[in-house]
């Protein structure tokens, strides 16, 4: 392998000649060969956008010559466009401030900008990773900013569209199924009737609340630490830089980023991400309940509840011919379990900041973005391959309604709880219908039973 010599404050180090990264990236590769969990692509993209915005603002403020600024901007645009993916090899398990990933971006952009200016990569480069690309910045404000930019982008561009699509599907099903009366269940036991549409309206409402929770978390995440530099005081950042770079990022992304009103909070804590991940966890809890309900209601086809039919997407067994399983529900509940685990990690990370800097940042970012990606992809898959194809089994639903003992609840206002309970117990013990048991006990006449026990009048209409 051909190498070139790069230097940092620790001295010279050999770097692969065909790579754009520099000394600090190479040292990180040597010192943190752990697990292979690379920094998420969303975070790399956010770092590139930050460097682009900073170069533009530093030029406007007279701190960076136009030729260098334009070269850094062009290099950052290449990264944003998906070029040079192999130049960001660092793992999550590194310094807790994300310094090495910040320097990875600085080095790559410095070397690439130098090439764009007609220079070389390496020690003779025309653009310096610290003095030019990282001007007016510190890893301590860059990395928290990248986390917020990546999180807001993931939520608004990927998660919320998937959430809305699934919510709208369930809301349509609620309308389509509104005339289907079914038996309710509490404690996994028969309860009073409701409509299948009412049941699905509950699912849609859960997702509507999650959408509200996520939107409520966004303003905190839109506050950016950039301009706080090392500890939040803004040392070495010029006046106006923080406000201008936030505005530049807002224009670049189309998202409402602003400078944080208190950069000590934004750098020392990860409360915005902890709060937002709580909304992701709540969404995962809702999706687990919805996916579980649907697979239980579709259980069978002959020996289960069988109230719903779901799409048959693939064979379900390597030994039982013809078996089809609720695989989308299974995938959904598994990924939601992973989100619950990620939430624990994010909470521990958020609680573990000391003094002026949280140093669990790469781990928090990794788990947050993992959760957002899982939920976005999981909801899209569940919607496309399950929810849109759900159909009611009307005959089975009607059969279970007629067999339910809990229709006796309609008699409570007329003959009282105790007599109604006697009717239900007698019917259950003797295997008869409620009507037969009620008439045998003499508590009601046939006409009264038929007038009072009417499922269509028991669903709140």
UniProtKB/Swiss-Prot annotation:
Its EC number is 4.2.1.2. It comes from Ralstonia nicotianae (strain ATCC BAA-1114 / GMI1000) (Ralstonia solanacearum). GO terms for cellular component: cytoplasm. Substrate binds at residues 97-99, 125, 128-131, 138-140, 186, 318, 323-325. There are 2 substrate-binding sites: the catalytic A site, and the non-catalytic B site that may play a role in the transfer of substrate or product between the active site and the solvent. Alternatively, the B site may bind allosteric effectors. It comes from the Bacteria. The lineage of its organism: Bacteria, Pseudomonadati, Pseudomonadota, Betaproteobacteria, Burkholderiales. This is Fumarate hydratase class II. Keywords: Cytoplasm, Lyase, Plasmid, Tricarboxylic acid cycle.
């Amino acid at each position: 392998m051909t190498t070139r010599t790069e230097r940092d404050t620790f001295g010279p180090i050999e770097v692969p000649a065909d790579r754009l990264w520099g000394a600090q990236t190479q040292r990180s590769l040597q010192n943190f060969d752990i697990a292979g969990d690379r920094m998420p692509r969303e975070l790399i993209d956010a770092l590139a956008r930050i460097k682009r915005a900073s170069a533009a603002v530093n030029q406007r403020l007279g701190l960076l010559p136009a030729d260098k600024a334009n070269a850094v901007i062009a290099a950052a645009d290449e990264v944003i466009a998906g070029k040079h993916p192999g130049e960001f090899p660092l793992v999550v398990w590194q310094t807790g401030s994300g310094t090495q990933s910040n320097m990875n971006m600085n080095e790559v952009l410095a070397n690439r900008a130098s090439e764009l200016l007609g220079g070389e990569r390496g020690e003779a480069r025309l653009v310096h990773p610290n003095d030019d690309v990282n001007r007016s910045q510190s890893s301590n404000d860059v990395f928290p900013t990248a986390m917020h930019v990546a999180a807001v982008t993931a939520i608004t561009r990927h998660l919320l569209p998937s959430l809305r699509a699934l919510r709208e599907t369930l809301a349509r099903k609620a309308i389509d199924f509104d005339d289907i009366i079914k038996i309710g269940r509490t404690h996994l036991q028969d309860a009073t009737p409701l409509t299948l549409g009412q049941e699905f309206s509950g699912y849609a409402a859960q997702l509507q609340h999650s959408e509200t929770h996520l939107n409520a978390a966004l303003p905190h995440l839109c506050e950016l630490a950039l301009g706080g530099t090392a500890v939040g005081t803004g040392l070495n950042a010029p006046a106006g830089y923080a406000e201008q770079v936030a505005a530049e990022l807002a224009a670049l992304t189309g998202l409402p980023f602003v400078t944080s009103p208190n950069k000590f909070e934004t750098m020392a804590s990860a409360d915005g991400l902890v709060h937002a991940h709580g909304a992701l966890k709540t969404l995962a809890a809702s999706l687990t309940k919805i996916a579980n309900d649907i697979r239980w209601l579709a259980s069978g086809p002959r020996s289960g509840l069988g109230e719903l039919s779901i799409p048959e997407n693939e064979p379900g067994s390597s030994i039982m011919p013809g078996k089809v399983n609720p695989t989308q529900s299974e995938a959904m509940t598994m990924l939601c379990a992973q989100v619950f685990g990620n939430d624990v990690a994010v909470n521990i990370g958020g609680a573990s900041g000391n003094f002026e800097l949280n140093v669990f940042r790469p781990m928090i970012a990794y788990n947050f973005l993992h959760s957002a990606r899982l939920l976005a992809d999981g909801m899209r898959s569940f919607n496309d391959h399950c929810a849109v194809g759900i159909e009611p089994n009307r005959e089975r639903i009607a059969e279970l309604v007629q067999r339910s003992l809990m229709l006796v609840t309609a008699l409570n206002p007329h003959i009282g709880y105790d007599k109604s309970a006697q009717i239900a117990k007698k019917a259950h013990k003797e295997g008869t219908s409620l009507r037969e048991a009620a008439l045998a006990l003499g508590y009601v006449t046939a006409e009264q039973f038929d007038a009072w026990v009417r499922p269509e009048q028991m669903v709140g209409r």
